Every structure is written in C-alpha cells, then in structure tokens.
Amino acid sequence: MKNLQLSRRDFLKISASGTLAFVLAEMGFDRALAAPPASQGRVTWSGIPLYDAPSFQANQLHLFGIDKVVSLKAEVQGDEGYGNPFNKTWYEVDGGYVFSGDFQPVETNYQKPIYDIPAGGRLGEISVPMSLTHLGPYTYAKNGHRLYYGSTHWIMKVVITRDEKSIWYEIFDDELKKSFYVPSYNMRLIPTEELTMLSPEVPAADKLIHVDLATQMVTAFEGQKMVLSTRCSSGQRGTDTPKGEFTTFHKWPSRHMTNQGDAVQNV
C-alpha cells in the first residue's frame, strides 16, 4: 500500500465529489481490503449452487444445504452478485466455485475450558462454524437455537456434568430472557484487553464514522486522522442504512441486531 493519508476534511470533500473510489484505489485501499478468506465457509441459505466457473451463467453442479461447511481453497473474481456491483468475489472450493455473498467465512478452533467465571459473567465468542444450544447441560437435552461463528454471548457459569464427563457454559440471552447451555469447547472466552476502549485519550466528539453509501465504504476518523477504511454492506431496499447524522450513545457486546427477538440467525 502507498504511504498516503487523508485528513477528515479532505476525505469529506472527496466523498462529496463522487471520486472516493478512485482516490482509495490510488492509495491502495482496494487491494488492502481484499483480505484472504478464512479456511472454511458456512452456507448461509439453503439451496446455494456450486458452479463449474465463477459465473452465475456457468453450469450448476450441486446445491448446498444451510450450515454446510466447506473448505475454501482460493479467492477469485467473477460475476457480480445479485446486481451488487461491489461484490465480484467468488471462492474456489472442492469441485467448483461458489459466490462469496452466500457464505460466512469461518474457522474451527476448539477451546479448552476455563473455570474462572466472575459473578457478573464473562463474554465468550463462538469459535466454530455453528454450535447448537441446549436447554440443559446434557448432550441429550432438548436443543435450543443455533449460534454462529464470531457471535458473542454472556457466560454466567461453568457446569460440569460428571455422569457424561462433559463441560458446559451457561449463557444468558437478555432478549429471550432465558438461559442456554453450550459445550465449552465451542466458545472462546474474550480477554479483558480486547474489550477496552479504543484511543481513550481522544475525546468522543473528535471520533467520526463516515458511511459512504455510494462506494459502500466505512471510514473512521480520530480528529483529522483517518484510522480505518473498510468495505461495508449497508443493506438492500427495506433494510438499507438511512442517510443523516447520528450519535452512537450505547454499544454493548452480545446485543441482538433485531427488534423482533429472533435469535436463530444470531450472527
């Protein structure tokens, strides 16, 4: 990447002029944003096709079911997805190609149990593609909902079921007002240092997040300094991001991104 920097003022001027995409490409941000995929991908919808080329016009070889996990071999460019000009990324998998927009990049990282859970709970993160919750701390207990890779949940205590030699984390869902149990090997306890405030020395009034709907880019500033620029997906019609100026006054881990209490697709 070229060692260039934009000030907050320059960035807003360029964004308003409609040349942001060109400038970011010149600065090398287009290449920087093309991070390599994870080693695995989880199918997010049922009936996702496998093609013999990275094109929706190519031959369909297979249909994947929801939550199927496949190994990702490479990232390639192909047809834009479903009329979205911002995403032309496809994944090469065994036997063909799949469109990236239908897959969640995931890893499978099993964890050792940690028994030290404070009275107020501790935040944990799902470290496998998908984990079923249970209504009790038993392998054969009735299943609850599914939790997906990268989602975070409050662990309230550790439960050891001696007769089946299993270890569980009890999590509490503040939307459903209910406790569930997750195998301890499927959750990573998040260290305190990962939850500390970013740049606490910078006043809140000097922090700005700029969402550019035209280029689908999110850029963060601390005063006049640009500290992050990354792609975003601002939503399609009906769930799109509204225009305007907004103040974020409350952010909290493990909050449902819905007002309907739907914990099924809790990503």
Feature map (PLM): residue ranges:
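SH3/SH3-like beta-barrel superfamily modules
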Residues: F64-P105, Y148-Y185
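C-terminal segment of N-terminal export signals and the immediately downstream linker at the start
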Residues: E26-F56, V69
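N-terminal secretory signal peptides
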Residues: M1-D10, S17-A21, A25, D30-L33
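Gly/Pro-biased beta-strand-loop elements
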Residues: S184-V267
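Short, solvent-exposed loop/turn elements at domain surfaces
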Residues: L50-D52, G81-Y82, G101-D102, L135, ...
